[in-house]
Structures are given as structure tokens and as C-alpha cells.
Amino acid sequence: CSSDLGILIAYFNEWVYLVALTGFIISTLSAISLPNIGSGSGEIKRINIKVLLSGFVYVWKSKIVLGTMTIDIVAMLFSSVMGMLPIFAIDILDIGPEGLGILRATPSIGALFAAMILSQLPSLRYPGRTLIYSIIIFGCATITFALSTVLWISLVALFIYGASDMISMNIRQIIVQLVTPDNMRGRVMSVHSVITTGSNELGDFRAGLSATIIGIAPAIMAGGALTVSFSIIWWFLFPGLKEVKDMKDLNN
């Protein structure tokens, strides 16, 4: 059961698992109801090392895809705070397990809010710039959370943290899929999945290791500052990313 449901556990005990089960059932039924779009040309290639590595090779050669994926690594490596929330809840905010549940849920609420807004918007103008802006905001939200000792300020920071992460994730996924040709998309998205999963775990490790050396708040604040700094560097390092005017231009 997700720790986002911590606040429900405090009041409903084991019944919270029924809530989680209901969510899984709805997700499964939604997936089953998806239409079958076929398998394209039906051509099957033999799997070998060259095929497996071709996704990484394509990412390295495509500057837009490389910039999009690596800025994700930067953001999650330096601004990951979710693994450190128990320390903030107990030692800094003094809000106990119920408060931890609220902290854990707040980024998800922010992400849901951002997703609802994005679903109503037309095609984004300058998606690359919006991506970098959102990650800068992500880093600033991390810094604010690290400095806060007041619950409502921490919640606002986490809300913005989750919302900006959703915006950047949405744009990253679209950019990578539109730029990548059909015959490479599966392999490139596999690389993207590996990078996303690995950077999340490495981010928690980085935060924990830094916290043991300089303290939890300075470690998180430094990570947020590095995220902002690297985002500015990426602005100049990958000029093609910020020059894309419209999503429609990506698959041309």
C-alpha cells in the first residue's frame, strides 16, 4: 500500500488496503479496455547486443533526446526529496506519521492538478523552454522545502514540486516519442525508463549520503541549487532544445 495513504491508515486502519485494491482494479480494467492497435509491419528482428545497444546509440546521437533525458537525470539525482520525508516529518516539522502521510500525498496532488490543467491546454509553444523552466521551478521548490520549518510552507513547496515534475515529465515523454522514429521508439523509451527509474533511486541515495555529511536540510537545499544551476547550463548546452517552437515541429 502506497505511503501516500498514510493519513487514511491513521483513521481507517486495514480498510485502507481496500482503497488501494479498488484503485488497482480500476487501473487493470482501464488497461484491458484499451483497443488493439496491431503490431505495425509485423517484422521481427533477432535480438542481439547491437540491437539492445542501438537505443543508447540513438539517444547519444540525437541532441534533443539526449538533452531531454539527461536533464531528467539531473533533476531526480539532485532534487529527490521523497525518501527524506520521514526525517522532515519527525525531526523538523514534528508532525508524526499522519503528517508524513500528508507530506507524501501533497506532490501527488500537485501532479494531479498539473495533469488536469495540461489536459485542457492546446499544443505547447516552445516545449523545450517550458521543460527547462519547469525543472528550474522544481529545483526552487526543493530549496524552499529544505528551508521551511512551517508545515503550510512545506506543503505549498511540495505541491509545486509535484506539479512542476508532472509538467516536465509530460513534456519529456512527448518530446522523446515525437522525435524518435517508429522503428526505434520502443528501444529509446526503454532507455528512458531505465534512466528514470535509476535516477530516482540514485537521487535518494545521494540525498541520504549528503545528509549524513552536512545535515538533511543543507543536503536537500544544495541539491535544489544544483538542479537550478544545471538547468541553466543545459539551456546553453542544448540550444536545439530551446529553439523548438511547437510540438508539431518535433516529428518533421
Predicted regions and their residues:
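Alpha-helical transmembrane-bundle signature of multi-pass membrane transport and export proteins
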Residues: 1-252
